[in-house]
Amino acid sequence: LYYHPPMISAAKKLCQVSGMDKVFFTNSGAEAIEGAIKTAKKYAYLRDGFAGHEIIAMEHSFHGRTVGSLSVTGTEHYREPFLPLMDGVRFANFNDLDSVKAQITDKTCAIIMETVQGEGGLYPAEADFLQGVRDLCDAHDILLILDEIQCGMGRTGYMFAWQKYGVKPDIMTCAKALGCGVPVGAFFLTQRVADKSLAPGDHGTTYGGNPFVGAAVSAVFDQFKACDLLGHVKEVAPYLEQKLDELVEKYDFLVTRRGKGLMQGVVCKLPVGKVAAAALEQGLIVITAGADVLRFVPPVSYTHLRAHETRRHL
């Protein structure tokens, strides 16, 4: 309900590093997605004078487990037990611009995607695809929502993954490493969208942006700057890629590696759940992504030594 110094300080730092103009603090990534969806719908409602607008999301995407965020998640086994979900969602194929074009109607208000698909198998957006989607959004007055909840906060060597592409969203979501363990998320808006969407009372939060999390977010960004963590990720990530490539070359049951920065996946012919469990017994925490990908998402403080140990454990 009120502004306070820790919130203001955190918001200024977030807007400065992101190039966005407004930020709304939430408690989680899923809540940030909910806020982004509401913003897009309100924008289209004010523009067109009616409700019932649609959103285009990507197949094999993951945006959260609340009803709204699950509605734009393109992974069926997450959705199926909770159907029917929010209507007005169409799904297109990631990195397939023609597929996106085919889903656009006069009711489309937003296109939402992860800049790097995590749960879907560690697929980075192709540069031509992301720029093409941006161009489609500009041509049809559709808002581009980029989900940076997993791939943001320095993981790719840029504070936000989209910054490497130079394709700016209208709305962005962030969470996870934003508070380094403190529960906080956020959605960001350009000034143009902020001026033509949510009004006071349209959206709210009881605990989002409280003084504690505001101080935590500020401390995280101070640490990024003091330790040059973006530069560190750009230095250590190629070494991790090299170590994973060596494993792929050595073992026939490993097929290929893909990803960006410290967000890597290795396609595996063996049951990945069993491989992840065996790695845990060796003291290495890895997770799965889809049915056949081992996902490596180490902290941005990851070192060359840790990358070497990762290879040794595997």
Over which residues does each language-model region extend?
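Conserved N-terminal phosphate-binding loop of PLP-dependent enzymes in the Aspartate aminotransferase
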Residues: 1-306, 311-314
